[in-house]
Amino acid sequence: MPAGSPENHVSAELLGILRDDLNVDVSRVTPDARLVDDVGLDSVAFAVGMVAIEERLGVTLTEEELLSCETVGDLQAAIAAEPRETRDE
């Protein structure tokens, strides 16, 4: 996959959100890592993550979309599948 591909951008930003916004040790995060059992996210972390994804990636996921993601890879795919918002702010 090319370095500048959208998938790599989403992956890098998601790892940044996990590290910076949710204080996750990303050295153990893989696409197969389960968000709750392996990464340790709880309901508060999901809410913070939802806001961070919107702010940093311009993608709005519904609560249902976010909660349907079991793994980091599922979350990456859900983000990549959503259209990015353009902001005039």
From Swiss-Prot:
**Which UniProt keyword terms apply here?**
Cytoplasm, Phosphopantetheine, Phosphoprotein
Q: Which Pfam families match?
A: PP-binding (PF00550)
Instruction: Summarize the PTM comment.
Output: 4'-phosphopantetheine is transferred from CoA to a specific serine of apo-ACP, leading to the activated holo-ACP form.
Under which pathway is this protein filed?
Siderophore biosynthesis; mycobactin biosynthesis
Protein's cellular compartments: Cytoplasm
Origin superkingdom? Bacteria
Could you name the Gene Ontology cellular component terms for this entry? cytoplasm
List the SUPFAM superfamilies hit by this protein, alphabetically: ACP-like
Q: Which residues carry this modification: O-(pantetheine 4'-phosphoryl)serine?
A: S43
**Residue stretches making up the Carrier domain:** 8-83
Known role: Acyl carrier protein involved in the formation of acyl-S-ACP intermediates within the mycobactin biosynthesis process.
Protein name in the entry: Acyl carrier protein MbtL
What is the scientific name of the source organism? Mycolicibacterium paratuberculosis (strain ATCC BAA-968 / K-10)
